[in-house]
Design a protein with these regions (language model features):
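Short N-terminal binding/cap micro-motifs at the start of the first secondary-structure element
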Residues: 12-17, 35-36
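Short aromatic-glycine-enriched beta-strand elements
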Residues: 18-27
């Protein structure tokens, strides 16, 4: 699980049936306090939280847990956006996003 920033949309001419109606995004891991990039962007499915480009989100990056969030055990998914982050508190520092 990591905090990331939605940096783009992903489009496909064909989708697996379990992904119909779901939005796909590129999410780059970030340090939640400094907002500095912490890795390469990955594709993640919006788990119904209403994320969009520029959103700071919480990503479940483990296939079985991601499929559980989507309630579809056969979905070909590794990462799902499970929350939009409002704020992070770490080491006495509070970072607000909303």
């Amino acid at each position: 699980m990591f905090v990331g920033e939605v940096v783009g949309n992903v489009w496909g001419t064909r989708k697996h049936a379990s992904l119909e109606g779901k939005r796909l995004f590129l999410v780059r891991p970030i340090d939640p306090v400094t907002e500095k990039p912490a890795g390469e962007a990955i594709m993640a499915v919006d788990g119904g939280v209403g994320a969009g480009p520029g959103s700071i989100v919480l990503v479940m990056d483990e296939g079985n847990s991601a499929r559980t969030i989507l309630k579809d055990k056969k979905a070909p998914v590794r990462a799902v956006i499970c929350a939009v982050v409002d704020r992070v508190t770490a080491g006495g520092t509070v970072k607000r996003y909303a």
